[in-house]
Amino acid sequence: MSAFDPQAHSPPRCGPQFPSIGQEPPEMNIYCESFLHPQTMPSPQRPSNFETGDYSTTANPYLWLNGPSITPPPYLPGSNSSHFMPQAYGMQRQLLPNMHGLGSSELGWLPIPSQEELMKLVRPPYSYSALIAMAIHGAPDKRLTLSQIYQYVADNFPFYNKSKAGWQNSIRHNLSLNDCFKKVPRDEDDPGKGNYWTLDPNCEKMFDNGNFRRKRKRKSDVSPNGQLSSDKPEGSPLSESPTNGEHQDMLGNSSPGTDDSPEKRSPPPSITPCLNNFLSSMTAYVNSATPISRSVPLGLSNETSDKMGQNMVGFNSYTPLSNMPSHGGSDWSSTVSSNPFGYSSSVFNQFTPHFYNSMSTNNTLYNREGTEV
C-alpha cells in the first residue's frame, strides 16, 4: 500500500459534518472506501484491519470510530499528524471504557444497580415478628423501645423506607398480639418515653438464624418438675393420653407402667364376641313364636351357642319362582307376597318395626362399659 498525505488528497466530500448517531452512514462508507483504495484491490470491511506496521493490534471494536480516549498513530511520521477519520465524524464515545476484549464483559455498559438499590426494590423474606425478634436479639441489653425497633428496621432494610406508616402499624400489632414479646416498664432513673420490649426466654429457641418459626406451644414440652416430658415429635400418634392408652391395651401393646394401675379400665370386648352376640340375638328373635315385648339380655349362653347351627332354619322357606305352579293373575296376587325376593310373608313379618324398636343398639350390639370414646 502506498503512503499518501491525507491533507493534500482528501476531498471535501470525505469529511462532512455528520451528527453523532452511533453508526456510519452507508453512503459515506462506500465513498471513503472507494476513494482510499483502488478498485482493483480488495477493500477491507473495517478500516481497523489495514495491514500497516504503524498500527498496534487492539481488540477494541470502536477503534475506527476514533473515540477521544483513543490516539492512533498517523500514517506519515511528522509533526503535522492527522487521524484516519475526521474528528468531527468520530464524536461517539467509547461504550466499553474498561473493556479488554469482547468476551470478558460484553454487558459492562449496562446500568447495573447497586446492592442498596436492589434492597430497596426487593422485600425482605422475614415476617414482622422476625424483624422485631432480630432487633431485640441484636440489642446489647436485649431490650428496645418501639422507636428503636423502627430505627433498626429502617436502617437494615431499605425496602421499608418508602411506606413507613403501613409496616409500623404492623410492628405495633405484632408487639401487642404476640406472646413472645414482653413489655418492660422503664426504670425511674431512666429518662425517656415509652416502655421497653424484650423477648420471652421461652421463645428464644424459636428464633433460629433469623427465621421466626411460628409454632404453637405444647403442654408436653415442659413438665411440672422443669424437665422435658418426652422427645416425641409434635402430632405423634403415640402421644400419652387416656384414649390412646385404651387402644394400646386393646392391641396388647400396653406399657409396663400401666399394668399395675389400680384404676385400670376394663378393655372393650373384641369384635368376634360382639358379632356372635348379634347373631345369637337375631337367631332368638327369628326362632321365637311369641311376640317380642322386651329386649334379650346380652350374653352368649350355651342354649344360643347350641342353636348357632339352627339359626338359619327360618330362612329355608325361600321358594324359587321357577318351581311354583302356574296361577292366574288373581291367584298369584293372593298367594304370593309382594316382596321381590321370593321370601314367604311369615319370615318378613318377624322383622316388623316392633322387632327393631325392641332392639337396643346400646345394650345389644356393644357393651357400654369400657367402650366410651
UniProtKB/Swiss-Prot annotation:
Keywords: Activator, Developmental protein, DNA-binding, Nucleus, Transcription, Transcription regulation. Transcriptional activator. Activates ectoderm, in addition to inhibiting mesoderm and endoderm formation; required at the blastula stage for normal formation of both the central nervous system and epidermis, the two early derivatives of the ectoderm. In addition, also required to maintain the regional identity of the animal cells of the blastula, the cells that are precursors of ectodermal structures. Also plays a role in differential adhesion, which limits cell mixing as primary germ layers become specified. This is Forkhead box protein I1-ema. The keyword Transcription applies. SUPFAM superfamilies: Winged helix' DNA-binding domain (SSF46785). Residues 1-23, 208-274 are annotated as: Disordered. GO terms for molecular function: DNA-binding transcription factor activity, RNA polymerase II-specific; RNA polymerase II cis-regulatory region sequence-specific DNA binding; sequence-specific DNA binding. PROSITE patterns: FORK_HEAD_1 (PS00657), FORK_HEAD_2 (PS00658), FORK_HEAD_3 (PS50039). Its main location: nucleus. The lineage of its organism: Eukaryota, Metazoa, Chordata, Craniata, Vertebrata. It is found in: Nucleus. Expressed dynamically in a dorsal to ventral wave in the animal cap ectoderm in late blastula and gastrula stages. Expression is present in the cap in a salt and pepper arrangement which is maintained throughout early development. Expressed in lower levels in the mesoderm. At later stages, expression is lost from the developing nervous system, but epidermal expression persists through tailbud stages. It holds the Pfam family Forkhead. Residues 238-258 have a biased composition (Polar residues). Residues 123-217 bind DNA. It comes from Xenopus laevis (African clawed frog). The keyword Isomerase does not apply. GO terms for cellular component: nucleus. Induction: Inhibited by nodal signaling downstream of vegt, and by notch signaling downstream of dvr1/vg1. Neurula stage, but not early stage, expression is regulated by canonical wnt signaling. One of its GO terms (biological process) is regulation of transcription by RNA polymerase II. InterPro entries: Fork_head_dom, FOX_domain-containing, TF_fork_head_CS_1, TF_fork_head_CS_2, WH-like_DNA-bd_sf, WH_DNA-bd_sf.
